[in-house]
Amino acid sequence: MEYPKFKVTVSCMTYNQSKYITDAMNGFTMQQTSFPFVCTIVDDASTDGEQEVIRKYVEDNFDFSEGSVAYHKETDYAHITYAQHKANKNCYFAVLYLKENHYSQRKPKMGYLSEWRDMCEYEAPCEGDDYWIDPDKLQKQKRYLDDHKDCSICHTNVKWYIQNTGKYIIKQEWKEFNKSLESRQDIIIENILDSNKYYIQTNTVLYRTKVYNSLSDELLGFRKLFLLGDTTLWCLLIRHGKIHYDETITSVYRINTGSVSHQNNIEKKLRFYLSGAEMRLYMYNYLGLNNIQLFDKFNAEYKQIFFLYRAYNRNYVRFIDMKWNNKIFEHLYNIMDNFITSCVIKRFLSFYFLIKNIHK
């Protein structure tokens, strides 16, 4: 099929977000652009009725009349629908309703989108529970990257929506810090790795697809090592070009808070923290950074979190060497297999997270 000359692909990966996906799709279709763009929505075999929500939205808002460009097709992995929006003629949807959950099988999904992605100069990610509120987001960001060929990624300010309280939060300190580093491109990567001091929210981003594709092998390797992949992507994109920050709030990041007082949740939380600590140390060495104070900080954080996680999973094998300057901490690590020590740490963490959750 002959497609329009799409300039931007919107990448939306979603699973069991039936309550929120309409907000995301409304954010896509509201975009006012001077160019055609395609929104690739991949539902990973949701079990909460999300696929039905998406189908209903597409049927109601997209053109399936005789002579339209719309089509349905089935492959061995998905049912696919492609159509043009009824009112916003520059907006197209390509929706993939996956037949099997790929995340649980660790099967990649990006390859399914090459039919549309490969023709696009830029890509804008937005997961199914987040959404855009600025109708000019794509237009402004594309224009900036068109005019600044040395820039590989741009992003904007964001506000958080706390789902269980209904409150919005705007982090003023992030805005000020991000703007202060606009002329210090040389230290932005360090400040991304250092607890996200330089903050990039995924659904505010637009980056060059060609640069992303050139990093695919590296990114695939990182995804096999770490539980979070966006930070490594930002670092690699910035290594290949400049980054631009726009203080305009274009997007909303939704936070769904749940109970962390149960042991299984605490273990998963610690595992996520540990993966982040591993990633920071690994990327410090991988990118050849030269800041000994930052290295010492990352190393200390890694040891502390690893020490705590061992209370829950004594079989976990580290893949990053530890450097010990303090014999006491080295000794404590060596006795972590002691059952009593593990129980004490578990009880302490259960109490800590319970109190922290109560006072939120």
Where are these regions (language model features)?
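Short, well-formed alpha-helical segments that are part of the catalytic scaffolds
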Residues: Q17-M30, E52
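Acidic donor-binding segment of Leloir-type glycosyltransferases
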Residues: T29-L96
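Active-site nucleotide-sugar/metal-binding loop of Leloir-type enzymes
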Residues: M110-Y122
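Conserved donor NDP-sugar-binding/catalytic core segment of glycosyltransferases
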Residues: D136-K171
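Conserved nucleotide-sugar donor-binding catalytic segment
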Residues: T156, W174-I266
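Catalytic core of nucleotide-sugar-dependent glycosyltransferases
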Residues: D186, F226, I249-T257, Q263-I292, ...
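Membrane-interface aromatic/basic loop that binds lipid-linked glycans or pyrophosphate carriers
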Residues: Y302-K360
